[in-house]
């Protein structure tokens, strides 16, 4: 329980209670999400029974976590956005642009409040339940979450009254945008609506078509000026549906359908496992072990840093988390206590943050497999050698630099290695544990992720005592802004993906490509360019949802193996994260190492070139992807 200082106002007390309640609901949801599948495995294995409706509870906990977690992400101001354009604006324009962005975001969120309320009432009747809980209760967390995000955007829009009113006017604008959903709600409660409501609805349809086109352009421009990506993606989808007379409830419906799928719960679970690792001293133990193993090799510290970064990115699913969590430790190892220059170290750490995307249990591979409707196992098998190529490329530059600068090495010390192995063995067993349980078919992917969370929580609290049990809620609350931010992007981008497919955009694009591009090589070159640019401007989860459905049919036309196409897709986006001037990892690195962005650009270029070479090898030599599939697929 928290204590309030004497004289604390009643308003402050209420705010603190509400904040603690919000944290508590998010934590309990994440805790149950991690625990239920693990308990299910135990009950099935030892007692041949299970928890009734356990899968449905888990899926709907993810749904709840998406929107309440999204509200918490807004509270921490952690929703993904592109700030590069905003940073180059004159100071006198930054304030007005921020108000316009806030107004747009509030308007779109308000429109989603109405459409999700309509969806909750029209899609499910009161008898639809999960156990004893009506499904509508879960669905209602969608408008609650959108409302919470909108209120927080308003709160952060400005400290001055007039600009805040201008931003707050977005609630009115969003209500106008959502008139068809409001009409549906009114009709649901009052079936005998007067005829003038029908007249108003017809007038709304006439007006919304030209207005939507303008708003879509404004929204896209706002994305480059710092507006939240999930707002832009969801807003564009909403306006496209409105412009064509589509049901606006389709977007909440698509979000719901996606979030209650079997694979999506894996994302928050592996992210939580990664955060537990990053909050413990696991990074220090692994650095110590790999240093002992490779210190006798010139560039051994680099090899150790690549392996540790790969390990963490694999589990968190976010290269930015690796940079933020391990950047400080590895900076000390490589520069302050090591032989490498600051320029080399910051460039290397910026580039190595995303190396782990191609190794199991990479969340990006899982999500791509779901979208492309191909085997997750095949994707993991196909990604293994390309992942090794990228990883070895990063190691080689360290070895070359060490040789050129005659960096001193240390004799191999078996005692140091043995001690490091003894201290970190439990963390090293985690990927082995995942591979055995999942690939041997003992547990599902969801159950494997759940057991991974339980396993690593026990190791870090009971075995190593790096964390106490009472620290776990704090770790969860740190993880939830990442989890909520990613899940709400997936939910909102699903609507845009659905519209793109429904409008037959992939078919039109495929026909155009067939008529204008005959060479497979030219197609792959263009694909590399487009995807690298996409990686600069979109996070990888949004890109998978929105861009992959466009690319997959094109790959079929040119005879690209589906798994190879997936690896090309992910490797390009990975490179986009470190592509100047707007790659996401560049901003995170600038923040973590407290260096000017221009300096980070310069430092990362050699590593960008090396990873580009690795990407070209992966793209134009499909054998590296398909050889293991031929043996084990």
Give the residues covered by each predicted segment.
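Alpha-helical transmembrane segments and membrane-interface helix-loop junctions
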Residues: 1-197, 488
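Alpha-helical transmembrane segments of multi-pass membrane transport proteins
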Residues: 127, 139, 164-633
């Amino acid at each position: 329980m928290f204590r309030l200082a004497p004289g604390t106002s009643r308003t402050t007390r209420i705010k603190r209670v509400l904040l603690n309640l919000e944290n508590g609901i998010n934590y309990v949801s994440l805790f149950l999400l991690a625990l239920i599948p693990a308990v299910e495995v135990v009950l099935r294995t030892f007692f041949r029974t299970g928890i009734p409706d356990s899968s449905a509870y888990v899926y709907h906990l993810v749904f709840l976590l998406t929107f309440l977690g999204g509200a918490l992400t807004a509270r921490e101001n952690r929703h993904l956005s592109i700030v590069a354009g905003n940073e180059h604006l004159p100071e006198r324009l930054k304030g007005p642009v921020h108000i316009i962005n806030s107004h747009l975001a509030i308007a779109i969120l308000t429109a989603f409040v109405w459409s999700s309320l309509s969806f909750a009432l029209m899609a499910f009747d009161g008898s639809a339940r999960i156990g004893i809980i009506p499904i509508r209760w879960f669905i209602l967390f969608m408008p609650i979450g959108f409302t919470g995000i909108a209120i927080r955007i308003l709160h952060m829009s400005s400290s001055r009254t007039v600009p805040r009113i201008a931003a707050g006017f977005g609630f009115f604008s969003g209500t106008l945008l959502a008139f068809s959903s409001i009409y549906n709600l009114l009709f649901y409660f009052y079936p005998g609506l007067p005829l003038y409501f029908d007249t108003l609805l017809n007038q709304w349809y006439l007006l919304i078509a030209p207005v939507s086109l303008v708003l879509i352009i404004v929204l896209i421009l706002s994305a480059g000026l710092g507006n939240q990506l999930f707002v832009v993606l969801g807003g564009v989808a909403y306006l496209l549906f409105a412009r064509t007379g589509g049901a606006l409830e389709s977007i909440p419906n698509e979000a719901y359908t996606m979030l209650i799928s079997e694979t999506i719960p894996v994302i928050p679970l592996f992210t939580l496992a990664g955060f537990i690792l990053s909050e413990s001293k696991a990074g220090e133990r692994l650095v110590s072990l790999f240093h002992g193993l490779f210190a006798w090799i010139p560039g051994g510290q680099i090899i150790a840093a690549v392996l540790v970064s790969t390990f963490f990115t694999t589990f968190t699913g976010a290269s930015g988390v690796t940079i933020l969590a391990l950047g400080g430790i590895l900076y000390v190892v490589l520069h302050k206590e090591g032989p490498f220059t600051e320029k080399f170290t910051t460039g290397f750490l910026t580039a190595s943050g995303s190396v782990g995307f191609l190794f199991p249990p990479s969340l990006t591979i899982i999500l791509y497999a779901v979208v492309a409707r191909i085997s997750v196992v095949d994707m993991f098998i196909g990604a293994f050698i390309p992942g090794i190529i990228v990883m070895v490329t990063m190691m080689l530059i360290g070895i070359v630099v060490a040789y050129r600068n005659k960096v001193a090495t240390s004799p191999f010390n078996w005692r140091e290695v043995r001690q490091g192995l003894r201290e970190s063995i439990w963390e090293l067993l985690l990927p082995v544990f995942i591979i055995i349980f999942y690939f041997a078919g003992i547990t599902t992917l969801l159950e494997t992720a759940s057991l991974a969370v339980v396993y690593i929580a026990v190791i870090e609290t009971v075995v190593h005592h790096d964390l106490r049990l009472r620290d776990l809620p704090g770790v969860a609350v740190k993880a939830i802004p990442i989890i909520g931010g990613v899940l709400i992007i997936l939910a909102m981008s699903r609507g845009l993906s659905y519209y793109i497919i429904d409008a037959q955009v992939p078919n039109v694009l495929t026909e155009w490509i067939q008529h204008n591009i005959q060479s497979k090589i030219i197609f792959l070159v263009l694909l590399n360019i487009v995807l690298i640019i996409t990686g600069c401007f979109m996070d990888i989860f949004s890109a998978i949802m929105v861009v992959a459905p466009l690319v997959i049919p094109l790959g079929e036309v040119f005879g690209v193996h589906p798994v190879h196409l997936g690896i090309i897709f992910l490797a390009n986006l990975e490179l986009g994260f470190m592509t100047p001037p707007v790659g996401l990892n560049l901003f995170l690195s600038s923040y973590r190492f407290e260096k000017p962005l221009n300096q980070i650009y310069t430092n990362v270029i050699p590593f960008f070139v090396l990873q580009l070479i690795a990407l070209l090898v992966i793209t134009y030599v499909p054998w590296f992807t398909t050889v293991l599939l031929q043996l084990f697929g």
